[in-house]
Regions:
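Cation-handling catalytic/transport regions enriched in His/Asp/Glu
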Residues: 1-184
């Protein structure tokens, strides 16, 4: 029923079941092994949610930037190293004041990318505090923004939005694709 209701036509129920089986047979055992290693290295009998973010070597959290401008400049260098077009798109966000990244009193929590339909320029919102996670979030949201730039030429507004099954593909892929450039 849901396949018909959601107008899904590019993959089948059998594809979903096969994907589930693949995760169960390949990813689950790897996750269990990693969890066991984490438990052992932390000297715990049982892992709890708050144990998952702890560095098992006891290293302090990374502080890759002090000022938001440093993060923006670093991300720009990363994107320009990957592709002139990506770098130019990212710089366009800054030039058009479409990056609201500084934390400040009274600012809503979270991070997101929002496509401004009239100007057809994405807007990125987050609360940067100098952490590695902030850099990852910026790159993730930039992935959404790049997807918006590339779909912005479409005439109908509804064609510019990605369906829920695809919405995170561009952003999560951008996180992975940028890894080789993080020394920039």
């Amino acid at each position: 029923y849901m396949f018909a209701a959601m107008h899904r036509f590019d993959y089948t129920i059998d594809d979903c079941l096969e994907f589930h089986d693949s995760i169960e047979s390949v990813c689950q055992p790897l996750r269990h092994k990693n969890d066991e290693d984490r438990k052992q290295k932390l000297g715990l009998e049982k892992l709890r949610p708050w144990d998952m973010g702890v560095d098992i070597r006891g290293r302090p959290p990374l502080k890759p930037f002090k000022e938001v401008k440093e993060m923006v400049d670093g991300c720009s260098r990363i994107f320009h190293s990957m592709s002139k077009e990506l770098g130019d798109y990212f710089d366009l966000l800054e030039a058009n004041d479409c990056l609201d990244l500084d934390s400040r009193k009274g600012k809503a929590p979270g991070g997101y990318q929002y496509y401004l339909q009239k100007s057809r320029i994405p807007f990125i919102f987050m609360n940067a505090a100098g952490t590695q996670r902030n850099v990852e979030t910026m790159i993730h949201e930039a992935g959404h923004a790049f997807h918006s730039f590339y779909s912005g030429h479409l005439q109908l507004i509804h064609e510019r939005d990605a369906p829920i099954e695809f919405a995170e593909v561009a952003s999560m892929s951008m996180e992975l694709l940028t890894h080789p450039y993080w020394g920039e």
